[in-house]
Amino acid sequence: MWGRDYELKYISYPKSVAIIGASKTEGKVGYAIMKNLKDFNGKIYPINPKYDEIFGIKCYKSVLDVEDDIDLAVIVVPNIVVPKVLEECGKKGVKGAVIITAGFSEVGNYELENKIKEIAKRYNIRIIGPNCLGIMNTHINLNATFAKVFPPKGGVSIISQSGAVLNAILDIAPLLNIGFSKVVSIGNKADIQESDLLEYFLDDEDTKIVVLYIEGLKDKRFLKVAKKLSKKKPIIALKSGRTEVGKKAAKSHTGSLAGEDVIYEAAFKEAGIIRAYTFEELVDLIHLFSTQPTISSNEIGIITNAGGFGVLAADSCVDYNMKLSNFEKSTIEKLKNILPPTANISNPLDIIGDATPERYKKVIEVLAEDSNVKGLLVILTPQEMTKPLEVAKSIIEVKNSHKEFKNKPLITSFVGGVSVKGAKSYLRKNGIPAYITPENGVKALSHLYKYSLMKVKEDYDEYLENIKEEFIKITEENKEIIKELLSNPNEYTAKKLLSIYGLPVPKGYLAKNEDEALEYCKKLGKCVMKIVSPQIIHKTEAGGVIINPKNPKEAFKKLIENAKEYAKRMGIDNLIIEGVLVEEFIEKDMMEIIIGAKRDDIFGSVVMVGLGGVFVEVLKDVSFGISPITRDFAHEMLRELKSYKVLEGVRGRPKRDINFIVDTLIKIGVFMDIHKEIKELDLNPVFVFNEKEGGCIGDARIIK
């Protein structure tokens, strides 16, 4: 964080570690860390003026007394002493520090935390923490934590804001035979952020999978770095606090719908991060990605000894965008020779309730060799003739003896409790995920498929880049008028501003009196009249819209009266009425949607699309993306909508102009990226015409 030329190797691969606050007293953190470092491949230097030695290792009064170079300092002294020892580390030339000590910003002690940040910056020391569990690197036997468990060596690197969550994962890992590479508890993140570590893991050969436990992000670089890393290595994240923080303060439709969690959801989706929603799912995903290959096709085979669960799994294929493979002819012939005559050879493949371990084994072997089957789900239910543990052993045997499973995931669902407990444990320990339900098995395969799609997704979009260039030029050429329009944002000025950037809006005028209203209505022919007031957000509720008025003068007066009555009813003091917007009436076959945007402190411009008009906050059929938005991602956003089929045309209804929506989403994202003074933007409704006919922004609201 202090500079862009830094390296984290002195923290992750130190050759020497000083433990400042090392202790001989059992139960103290300094004792636990000394004990955990006993097998470290490098040199250890205990620092504590009370002792001459600890565990038979010479103890020093200060890091300044150590003759050798020190790469990493682990600090476990009281919080008020931390600045002093960190200063000494700086003078000694220590490259990195892990500050275990608590009592900083997490308890409101920002002054003390700022002090250590200033010292670290002055001496160019990289800091992890404060208020953290510590760090591990299994590849050099580095356990600079006070955790009880040191996990097996492997390819999973984990970054966590919670020491407790980290401890729980480490405790579970041996049961699942999950191997770890780097383990980092980042605590308060005074210096090193998630993005710093993600950037480091990009080229770390020992890291194959990255796991995140996030409570909140501070660093705006996170999205960019995560997007780059996820192309090479899976990133799995669990985000706690899934509540819509700040929703009450939101002033627009977009603001009220774009709570904290939906923004994180959009960011993870755009960065290619695989999101876990529960701790259990996080552990399952770690096990899945550390044991199974990804698949480039969504065609899977399902084996079951119970027809009902096969049907449930097939239903889940629809839910998770997976397909049932068509077995090759040679596969069908082989299966006929293996299965009883009563077996129906189709997918899902019901191998009958009396299926033996040998039958399971032979069927799995056949489907392993079928090139149409890209992934395999094996379901077992405990029946009188079933031997779950023996079946589990046969599955492991097939997996280990068939090279096809290097590129073909093999997932199991042993449905039951007591009868299958041992078998599931055996499968997991031997690298086969075992789920309690078939639905979760299908979902697991879908994760492997979605990740493979994300890896090959093209991030560069020439159209997007052209829009960026065009909008920058427009902004420069229209500086003064844009500044004037943004000085008093209302529907009229918002639409004028959007039209400068080529976004389609109805022709309209702002009437200040009855005579102007009449004049403008005559100009436009069939028209719509709308009240313009910064205090009236929902015009329909206020009686602030009149369509095709017979008497524009009377309509003008009526809109003013309605606005005043609404203000009185809602307790609005000092009502400001800026006039009445008179616009052309759009007479086309159309569908209403909403497009909006919100400024987020971490992720920047968040763009929203959904079913529009008055129903947006009732149905909440919306999707979010982080700008800049590519055409592919804009299409993904639309496909997430439950109402997407309506856009495509159903039951005789015409197909709408989806390309117009995609184009508008891209442009609104770029518009928001340029105008950082805008906090929220609502385009509701946006009229979408029939295919290739475009659309038009019906209403616009800008909040600065």
UniProtKB/Swiss-Prot annotation:
Cysteine-cysteine disulfides? none
Q: Which UniProt keywords apply?
A: ATP-binding, Ligase, Nucleotide-binding
Recorded hits in InterPro entries, A to Z, give:
AcCoA-synth-alpha, Acyl-CoA_Synth/Transferase, ATP_grasp_subdomain_1, CoA-bd, Ligase_CoA_dom, NAD(P)-bd_dom_sf, Succ_CoA_lig_flav_dom, Succinyl-CoA_synth-like
What Pfam families does the database record attribute to this sequence? Answer: ATP-grasp_5, CoA_binding_2, Ligase_CoA_2, Succ_CoA_lig
**What's the top EC group for this one?**
ligase
User: Catalytic activity, per the record?
Assistant: acetate + ATP + CoA = acetyl-CoA + ADP + phosphate
Record GO terms (molecular function): acetate-CoA ligase (ADP-forming) activity; ATP binding
Q: What is its EC number?
A: 6.2.1.13
* UniProt subunit comment: Homodimer.
Q: What does this chain do?
A: Catalyzes the formation of acetate and ATP from acetyl-CoA by using ADP and phosphate. Can also use butyryl-CoA, but not phenylacetyl-CoA. Cannot catalyze the reverse reaction.
Q: Which family does it belong to?
A: In the N-terminal section; belongs to the acetate CoA ligase alpha subunit family. In the C-terminal section; belongs to the acetate CoA ligase beta subunit family.
The name on file for this protein is Acetate--CoA ligase [ADP-forming]
Organism, scientific name: Methanocaldococcus jannaschii (strain ATCC 43067 / DSM 2661 / JAL-1 / JCM 10045 / NBRC 100440)
